[in-house]
Amino acid sequence: MTALVKPDNSAHWYTEDGEPRHTRKNGKPTTLKDARVEGLYPSVTSILNIVSKPALESWKIEQGILSALSLDRNKDESIDGFAKRVVDNMKEMASAAPNFGTRVHHVLEQYNLSAAEPDEDDELYGWFKEYKFWFDQHITKVYEAETVLVNNQHGYAGTVDLVADHVQWGRCVIDFKTQGVKRKARFYDTWVQQLAAYQKCVEGDPGC
């Protein structure tokens, strides 16, 4: 059987001025070799992807099992053929979560920058309404929203969701996360590490 799941070696790269260089002019992803030649900085998330994430790996395995259980093997379908369909289905299911997160981030960005609100019949309005209540109660000034931050001293960069003044904590670096919450929300060490990395890109030692 040929390899069904290939490792994802993609990464995000930036120039020292914060310009994204995730892809080449031909549309292909920027490789590590390209980055070394051009002196590009890796993103914070690309660096953190090196760290093992047991919870994420368990979730991926779970998605594969669910895909295998939910699909019926076609008559005369080979093991390889069925396995490929399982992997394709697993990838489709797994991509739904980040796609949802991207849409939520866009809605929040619009409100952070211009107080623009989605229509009440928008499927994301319920999530936005909860965020708006929190924002209006706690945020007094927005400095940056969906902005690339660069640390030239240590050679990394990344896109921060929000840098703003909080009524209790003062100037803060804020990152939004979406997840399927069951009994309670889950929190991971890499989230703290990501915030700490962004914090070192902002003058004045903000909170996070």
Residue spans for each PLM region:
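Metal-dependent nuclease catalytic cores that hydrolyze phosphodiester bonds in DNA/RNA
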Residues: 1-157
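Mg2+/Mn2+-dependent nuclease catalytic core
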Residues: 146-208
